[in-house]
Regions:
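A polyanion-binding, active-site-adjacent surface
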Residues: 1-136
Length: 138
């Protein structure tokens, strides 16, 4: 269940469509927790994990209408090599491939969001529209 703020201001998260396995699949880049680095931050997903099983999982989901690629590992897997910044800036081109490129949600991105106001002004509204369309489709 989302945080209290999201529940108070957003859609009714209790609706069954948010938990309908035929509509939404959250597929991580690794099915393990890779641990912490020396400073206590989460380590990125090991490339071996996605190399081992990701293609099979994605093939088992043939009717995907929208892929939200969140973070560098997911962006590289879905869109190929490149900087997260460049892939997110090129979100319209990525949408042509059926992929919505997003930075990893983190407090570390606060400064990036302030330097890139287009993200919340342009990308986020389009993301909301696309997600709503997928969830409301019958």
């Amino acid at each position: 269940m989302p945080a209290a703020t999201a529940c108070a201001t957003g859609p009714d998260w209790r609706q069954t469509k948010f938990y309908d396995l035929t509509r939404v699949a959250i597929v991580p880049m690794a099915f393990c927790f890779p641990g912490y680095d020396a400073s206590g931050s989460d380590l990125p997903p090991p490339p071996l994990c996605a190399a081992t099983w990701r293609a099979g999982v994605m093939a088992a989901l043939p009717a995907l209408r929208l892929v939200l690629a969140v973070g560098g590992a997911a962006l590289r897997w879905h869109l190929g090599p490149g900087r997260v910044q460049d892939q997110v800036i090129g979100w319209r081109a990525a949408l042509a491939q059926g992929v919505f490129p997003l930075p990893h949600p983190s407090w570390r991105n606060t400064a990036w969001l302030k330097r890139n106001p287009w993200f919340e002004a342009e990308l986020v509204p389009e993301l909301r529209t696309r997600v709503r369309a997928v969830l409301e489709a019958e």
